[in-house]
Amino acid sequence: MWPERGVNPLDQARQLLRHLADARVQYDSIMLDIEGSNWINGSYTAIQNQDFVMALVNAFTEAGVPVAIYCSWQFNQTFGSNFTSLSRLPLIYAHYDNIPSYVDIADSPFGGWPSPSGKQFFDGAGGEQICGSGALDWDWSREPWW
């Protein structure tokens, strides 16, 4: 889920869950894609961003839906360097270094995660695709996190 920062987080969570139920979609978890200028454009403080993302996480958790977090090193800029409330959730981070390993995060951990659950290591900028799918990002993990 790409949360729209200017829209009520509870409404977004409820709407997504309603659409998934209406479409009878089976899923194991919801991944919150926390990145981009809508989080760090100066309109919101780190505390406001913390409250927003925790409202989303709590809404899904209360509905019995597991949550994972997708983000990058912008995390500290978005939430502040002392925010660790998400560290109990699986972390999938982006670092487009074309290396499928976690060696890069060991030197620059963030968010209180002891280790990530997955890494997006290639962004498909060359237009790589499968069966006309459009550009693909490539992810890696040591073991399934979902």
Predicted feature residues:
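Solvent-exposed loop/turn segments at secondary-structure junctions
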Residues: 2-7, 35-40, 67, 73-77, ...
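Alpha-helical scaffolding within the catalytic cores
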Residues: 7-22, 75-80, 101-108
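Short, surface-exposed, charged loop/turn segments at secondary-structure junctions
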Residues: 45-48, 82-87
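Short, well-ordered coil↔helix boundary/capping segments
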Residues: 47-50, 70, 109-112
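Functionally critical loop-and-helix segments that line ligand-binding/catalytic clefts
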Residues: 86-146
